[in-house]
Regions:
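Conserved beta-strand hairpin/beta-sheet module of binuclear metal-dependent hydrolase folds
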Residues: 2-63, 152-155, 159-163, 256
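Metal-dependent phosphodiesterase/nuclease catalytic metal-binding core
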Residues: 38, 152-214, 222-249
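FMN-binding flavodoxin-like domain, especially the glycine-rich phosphate-binding loop
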Residues: 173-213, 217-220, 262-278, 288-385
């Protein structure tokens, strides 16, 4: 696929609609794109490569744009294999081409490739520039967004930010869907742990005059950039995007599910806030993580199991912990037929998170929901709305 970002800047990335799991863990029903770009000037540069799954298609796109010319530079914004797998191929194909990266790039690169880097590298630091002729590139370090060597590249003539994995999303480019949903799921599951680092990058970007954002996944952003930047600001500050409630439950024989659904109905009667609900056992974990971050309040409902909490809830809370979940209101419901212990197992996760306000209105169900439990659920609802 060749797309004109401008007369001089070309998109040469590829869609991957055959992949079942991105990073061997995230379902991508609409596939994913691996984005790569070329700037045609007195000096020609390629910005990042693509995953090895799509090498042949990418090489064809590249050769079509180059039209017999030779690239002078390969900009390595990110070394992760879905963007860097073809560095070796390109270095071998064009032996006079220079590799442009930062010190961490070239420290890590030999771990992936056997390339003689002698006289082949251009090592850049924060704010360094590379002149291509009419176009000038400037480089800004973005460590841990979401790898240590990541940098972004800014082209000043056409005011384009090549943002690495920042502003990326799941989904092939020809997918007709709202950007925010799959960008949010991508952000919190890929970059969510690194909000402080994303904030640092946003502050650098705020000093640049940006008219287009070219990420390594998802569409090129060309209009209403403040919308996308504002969402990234909210997400990376760990602030709720929506003043609402997300009920995450799991249930072995359906009794905890009945309690969760009852709470959902009670909340619908009591408040106009947005209410979302999900069965953790039968839904995408990455989407559940996304929704936990999206809403201001989280309710977890789970049965006791093997002296702890049902495994899928344990997995869910572990995901939230490692992604830096914070600054939310939380309420808990447990079920147990003889020794309820789910809350005791869930509580330590929240105790380790920052800015978590836990409702005192905890609910314990003994096998099946009673009239008293329904009163308790109403009290829980009152405590979180």
């Amino acid at each position: 696929m060749n797309i004109n970002i401008s007369d001089a800047i070309k998109y040469i990335g590829v869609d991957d609609k055959d992949i079942d799991l991105f990073e061997s863990q995230y379902i991508v029903p609409n596939g994913i794109s691996y984005n790569s770009y070329v700037i045609l000037d007195e000096k020609i540069c390629v910005l990042d490569t693509v995953d090895k799954r799509k090498t042949d298609e990418w090489v064809a796109n590249l050769e079509n744009v180059l039209d017999g010319k030779t690239p002078d530079y390969l900009i390595i914004n990110h070394l992760e294999p879905d963007h860097a797998s073809n560095i070796q191929l390109l270095a071998d194909k064009y032996p006079d081409m220079k590799l442009v990266g930062n010190a961490k790039t070239f420290n890590m690169l030999p771990q992936f490739f056997d390339i003689d880097l002698t006289d082949r590298t251009v090592t850049v630091k924060e704010g360094d520039s590379l002149n291509l002729g009419k176009h000038t590139l400037s480089f800004y370090m973005a460590p841990m967004v979401h790898w240590p060597e990541v940098m972004v590249t800014y082209e000043s003539k056409e005011k384009v930010l090549f943002s690495a994995d920042g502003f990326g999303k799941f989904g092939a480019l020809d997918t007709d869907e709202d950007w925010a949903c799959e960008a949010r799921r991508y952000y919190f599951n890929i970059c969510g742990k690194y909000g402080v680092q994303v904030q640092a990058l946003l502050k650098k970007a705020a000093k640049l005059d940006i008219e287009k954002i070219c990420p390594l996944h998802g569409p090129v952003l060309t209009e209403n950039l403040s919308y996308y930047i504002n969402l990234y600001d909210i997400w990376s500050k760990y602030e709720p995007e929506v003043d609402g409630i997300f009920i995450a439950y799991c249930s072995i024989h359906g009794n905890t599910e009945k309690a969760a659904l009852k709470l959902y109905d009670i909340l619908k009667e009591k408040t106009d806030k947005k209410i979302a609900i999900s069965d953790l056992s039968r839904s995408d974990m990455a989407e559940n993580v996304e929704d936990a971050f999206k809403y201001s309040t989280l309710v977890v409902a789970a049965p006791s199991y093997d002296g702890g909490v049902f495994p899928v809830m344990n997995d869910f809370l572990h995901h939230l912990k490692i992604k830096g979940y914070k600054n939310r209101k939380v309420a808990m419901i447990e079920n147990g037929s003889w020794a309820p212990c789910a809350i005791k197992s869930m509580q330590p996760y929240f105790d380790e998170m920052k800015g978590i306000e836990i409702s005192d209105a905890k609910v314990t169900i003994r096998s099946t929901m009673t009239a008293e439990n329904e009163v308790q659920l109403a009290a829980l609802a009152d405590s979180i709305i």
